[in-house]
Amino acid sequence: MLSRILALADTGAGAESESATSSATTVERTWDVIVWNDPVTPMDVVVVILRRIFGYSTGRCTQLMLRVHHEGRAVVWTGRRQRAEQYCVRLQVAGLRCTIEQAT
């Protein structure tokens, strides 16, 4: 079951850093991808999913998972809206609760 979830989540490239770009006429806003705590998904599975989708180190994924566990949520990625939506869908397909919101 876990391998099927990971296979579904493992579609696309690893995370790349994206920053807001501005020009004389437009300013592109950045968006946060937020993972929310749930009572179902084991912590080690969250680490594996984050590692597969974003390509982060195990240590970074563990820190993010612990933040989700203790604080109820964690921003796991920030960048352009389209990419944030793609990551959110992949996280949801993998079984995690996820939303996006404008970065502050």
Question: What are these language model-derived features?
Answer:
Residues M1-T104:
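Terminal domain-initiation and capping elements
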